[in-house]
């Protein structure tokens, strides 16, 4: 079965940005409510977490649209939202990073050494490295998500860079796993059912894994879409 040719855009209409903003805010406030149900009321702590979770879900939607469009042609009309969702996910990692540096010393003061304020970050170096790689790769992709990006790189290299967004999602998964909550908190909840809903890490991880599973299925069924693209010499002339 031949893969559907995808459509890339370098600018979006205002309604697309509005809808994307609504989607992001819907995820954000849903997880604010979700944490409240789990006896974690609205605080700087939940704000930081839900900012990141909403970003991860927007990235998940952006990544899922490509494979879905190759399985179901009805999704082709939604492909322009890959850009708005992806850029929103990337830009909203900025307040997440800022909030991390603000709230961590307040939330976990016992984890910080009086003599060395970066002790928590050293102790959790892998978590920090995965977060750092996520942020840096996100920003690189953002820089080249404009018309000048494809002119500088050529179509094929540009498409390869855009596909590295899946690597961003893998970094996010590793970032989550390195926090030590998975599967420990899941098992604890299954044993106690002390809250009406599972830990927030459960729906977050499922949301992150879904587009990766879809991409693997897409590669198995349709092959790599890059193989169908002509070389840069033909594209950038």
Region annotations inferred by a language model:
Residues 2-237:
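Membrane-embedded alpha-helical bundles that constitute the cytochrome b-like, heme-associated redox core
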